[in-house]
């Protein structure tokens, strides 16, 4: 490989995004930003984008895993799980939820979501905060654009209507 074609077969950079290109290419290798696991046979499995991994008290939580769990509930229309600041545990999971038409936002509905996650996943993965929203920003292909949900200067934990479940996140005997 020459300097002009590092690791042939990969692309040379992002269009008009010099900083992002520089961050992605390190030591001649392209870093995709994906997080994967490998099983004992060498098979790779996609977990999530690294930027969507929530770091809580030393645990890595894939936002996609929490989203998939909460999507099992029939009245969830759209969902995005994001990291919010936590003074003790570094980050905490916040679920931003759009309900199906006709389903009303309430503490009881938030409790259903939280308890479902708590039952299906390790306690630390359950959303510590739940916020119901009218809609979520999406791309033309309907993928949620997480960085556009809140303005950077906003702390979503302090918004009106946020349900705080952090005090209920306790280790279960099997965790």
Where are these regions (language model features)?
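A general structural signal for short secondary-structure boundary/capping elements
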Residues: 143-144, 175
């Amino acid at each position: 490989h020459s300097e002009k074609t590092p690791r042939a077969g990969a692309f040379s950079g992002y269009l008009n995004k010099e900083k992002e290109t520089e961050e992605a290419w390190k030591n001649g290798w392209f870093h995709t930003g994906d997080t994967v696991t490998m099983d004992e046979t060498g098979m790779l499995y996609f977990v999530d984008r690294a930027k969507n991994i929530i770091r809580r008290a030393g645990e890595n939580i894939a936002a996609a895993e929490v989203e998939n769990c909460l999507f099992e509930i029939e009245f969830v229309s759209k969902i995005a799980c994001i990291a919010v600041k936590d003074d003790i545990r570094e980050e905490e999971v916040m679920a931003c939820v759009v309900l199906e038409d006709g389903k009303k936002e309430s503490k009881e509905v938030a409790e259903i979501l939280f308890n479902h996650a708590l039952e299906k996943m390790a306690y630390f993965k359950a959303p510590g905060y739940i916020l119901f929203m009218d809609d979520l920003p999406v791309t033309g292909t309907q993928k949620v654009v997480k960085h556009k949900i809140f303005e950077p200067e906003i702390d979503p934990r302090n918004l009106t209507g946020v349900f705080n479940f952090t005090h209920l996140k306790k280790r279960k005997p099997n965790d």
